Regions:
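Glycine-rich phosphate/adenosyl-contacting loop at the front of the ribokinase-like
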Residues: 1-76, 115
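Ribokinase/PfkB-type carbohydrate-kinase core domain
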Residues: 1-7, 100-179
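Active-site/binding-pocket entry motifs
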Residues: 12-15, 19, 98, 111, ...
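Short, flexible segments with low predicted structural confidence
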Residues: 15-16, 23, 41-43, 97, ...
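Residue-level signature of transmembrane alpha-helix interfaces in integral membrane proteins
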Residues: 27, 71, 90, 148-150, ...
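Generic recognition of cysteine residues
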Residues: 38, 81, 175-176
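Conserved N-terminal subdomain of the carbohydrate kinase-like
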Residues: 50-135
Length: 179
């Protein structure tokens, strides 16, 4: 088993980002790889760190596009799973007038939410210096249980744990948000 500087777990999705306007004045959207945990891994790869991803995408064109993007970036896909029934999660990203971004998610459910505890390769965690995860993997079952179990495995293995809150309120059930 290889050793990794950082192993991240969470959402891997397609961000449809506005990229200009058509001749008719309609917005043109570009399909880009997205998801906070993988964005972190991509930057770490550029800094020369060895990384791996744990998560789930749909067995669809977008899922295959994301797998290819991870491989091209140098991120290990050993922990990437494919769901044959649920599609890859999509997000439409639009800029507001103040320059901030607005996200509309198509995730009811999305493949990232369907990662099960038994699909997580805990050897990846035990062979990492840092385990990084984001809040979206805590929004729904079964990925919530898979994430909590993986956090516990990292803690038991003495792996440093990094958390990105990245709160997207529309994705949380009211009963789950506690302040």
């Amino acid at each position: 088993m290889e050793k990794y500087d950082v192993v991240a777990m969470g959402e891997l999705l397609i961000d449809f980002t506005q990229n200009g306007y058509s001749e008719q004045g309609n917005p043109i959207f570009e399909a880009n790889p997205g998801g906070a945990p993988c964005n972190v891994l991509a930057m770490l790869q550029k800094l020369g760190r060895k990384t791996a991803f744990i998560g789930k995408v749909g067995q669809d064109g977008f899922g295959l596009q994301l797998e290819k993007a991870l491989k091209e970036t140098g991120i290990s896909t050993e922990g990437l799973c494919f769901d044959e029934e649920v599609h890859t999660t999509l997000a439409v990203v639009q800029k507001k007038e103040d320059g901030d971004r607005d996200f509309s998610f198509y995730r009811k459910p999305g493949a990232d939410m369907m990662l099960r505890r038994e699909e997580v390769k805990e050897d990846l965690i035990r062979n990492a210096k840092i385990f990084h995860y984001g809040s979206l993997s805590l929004t729904d079952e079964p990925v919530r249980t898979a994430t909590v179990s993986t956090i516990e495995a990292a803690e038991k293995a003495g792996v440093w744990i990094s958390f990105d809150p990245n709160l997207r309120k529309p994705l949380w059930a009211v009963c789950c948000i506690r302040f």
